[in-house]
């Protein structure tokens, strides 16, 4: 049976080669006679799996030794609480700043409010004229030179790819140039993690839920500058204290072992595709194909300011919304799955993560073209 093209925003498609290897090793990992799901998290077999996954991730992103790499539980939303519990009080008065560009940065801001004094440094939550064009809320990124970052903040948080609204930062700002040299950047990179090169040293902390580009739901990767950890709030659970997790190499408590194993297979798959530079080239080609067609017709519309359009998550609407149900039914019949947009914005969304080949995007564009011929 042919597998359909899965455009889910997450949990998302995994590389077929990874799924096949996991199936082959399900009952016996590397001659151990055990499934990874049956291993002690402190036994030599899983220690080997976990340490190799960390080594491969460090290699892919060029993570230096003065940064800790941690595999944690709780997902991206959980990390929105774990980050402030670990960092917000590191300079005494608990304070953190946020750049709001969509749903997930807004959720992060709200969650951090439980732990200290939070401040909006910039927001795209209102309509604005950008490059001479009127942009709706959450379809643009405030220029960095307009951000109001407090020099006393413990960190500045941004979501570098908004999964729902389809907005992506093309670069991360230099906070020293904004008058805040002592404020580290915290980046939620969940939905474009490993999709392109990222200079992790530009951030004090980066985190990413695996279920977009790096594996199944259940594990979150955290890359943190070591001098920032060890100052958790007293209320922080010990299992979520970065100092504990880093000291025990992600095995302070029982980790999500199978999810880490799959993530490790994905890391090796990414390396085999040419690393993050190879993934960037492939992802650029896919995005250019899809956006190119959407921009060529008035039948569909992507509302995001072109320079900050996400290569991973492509929201679009049909000009005639009465056709939405017919569009989705036809897409499923054509083997194009999970194209319905998020309930908060409606319309459609095609998530074209690393595991989606160019062939799948071509199939989507052909369907878009055919549907327009029939209903346009």
From Swiss-Prot:
Residues annotated for L-glutamate binding in this entry: 42
Coiled coil region boundaries: none
EC top class named in words: transferase
One Pfam family cited in the UniProt record for this chain: Aminotran_5
Main localization of the protein described in the UniProt heading: cytoplasm
Cofactor binding annotation: Binds 1 pyridoxal phosphate per subunit.
Keywords tagged on the record: Amino-acid biosynthesis, Aminotransferase, Cytoplasm, Pyridoxal phosphate, Pyridoxine biosynthesis, Serine biosynthesis, Transferase
InterPro entries linked: Aminotrans_V_dom, Pser_aminoTfrase, PyrdxlP-dep_Trfase, PyrdxlP-dep_Trfase_major, PyrdxlP-dep_Trfase_small
GO molecular function: O-phospho-L-serine:2-oxoglutarate aminotransferase activity; pyridoxal phosphate binding
Assembly and binders: Homodimer.
Name of the molecule in the record: Phosphoserine aminotransferase
Function recorded in the entry: Catalyzes the reversible conversion of 3-phosphohydroxypyruvate to phosphoserine and of 3-hydroxy-2-oxo-4-phosphonooxybutanoate to phosphohydroxythreonine.
Residue list for modification N6-(pyridoxal phosphate)lysine: 212
Any one GO biological process: pyridoxine biosynthetic process
Chain positions recorded as pyridoxal 5'-phosphate binding sites: 104, 163, 188, 211, 253-254
Gene3D superfamilies for the chain: Aspartate Aminotransferase, domain 1, Type I PLP-dependent aspartate aminotransferase-like (Major domain)
């Amino acid at each position: 049976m042919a597998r359909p093209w899965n455009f889910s925003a997450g949990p998302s498609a995994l590389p077929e080669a990874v799924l096949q290897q996991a199936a082959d090793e399900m009952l016996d990992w590397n001659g151990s006679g055990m499934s990874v799901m049956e291993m002690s998290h402190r036994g030599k077999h899983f220690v080997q799996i976990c340490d190799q996954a960390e080594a491969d991730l460090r290699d892919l992103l060029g993570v230096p030794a003065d940064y800790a790499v941690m595999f944690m539980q709780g997902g991206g939303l959980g990390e929105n609480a774990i980050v402030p519990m670990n960092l917000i009080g590191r300079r005494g008065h608990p304070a953190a700043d946020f750049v709001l560009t969509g749903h997930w940065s807004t959720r992060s801001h709200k969650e951090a409010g439980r732990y200290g004094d939070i401040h909006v440094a910039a927001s795209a939550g209102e309509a604005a004229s950008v490059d001479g064009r009127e942009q709706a809320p959450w379809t643009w990124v405030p220029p960095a030179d307009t951000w109001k970052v407090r020099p006393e903040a413990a960190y500045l948080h941004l979501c570098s790819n908004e999964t729902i609204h389809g907005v992506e930062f093309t670069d991360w700002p230099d906070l020293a140039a904004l008058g805040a040299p002592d404020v580290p950047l915290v980046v939620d990179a969940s939905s474009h993690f490993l999709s392109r090169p990222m200079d992790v040293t530009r951030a004090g902390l980066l985190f990413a839920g695996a279920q977009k580009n790096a594996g199944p739901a259940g594990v979150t990767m955290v890359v943190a500058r070591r001098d920032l950890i060890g100052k958790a709030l007293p209320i922080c659970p010990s299992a979520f204290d970065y100092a504990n997790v880093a000291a025990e190499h992600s095995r302070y408590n029982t980790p999500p072992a199978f999810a880490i194993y799959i993530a490790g297979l994905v890391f090796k798959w990414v390396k085999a595709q040419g690393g993050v530079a190879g993934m960037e080239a492939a992802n650029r080609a896919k995005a250019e194909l899809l956006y190119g067609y959407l921009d060529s017709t008035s039948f569909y519309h992507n509302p995001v300011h072109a320079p900050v359009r996400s290569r991973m998550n492509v929201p679009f609407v049909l000009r005639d919304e009465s056709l939405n149900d017919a569009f989705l039914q036809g897409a499923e019949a054509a083997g194009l799955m999970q194209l319905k947009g998020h309930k908060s914005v409606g319309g459609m969304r095609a998530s074209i993560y690393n595991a989606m080949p160019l062939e799948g995007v071509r199939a989507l564009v052909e369907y878009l073209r055919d549907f327009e011929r029939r209903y346009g």
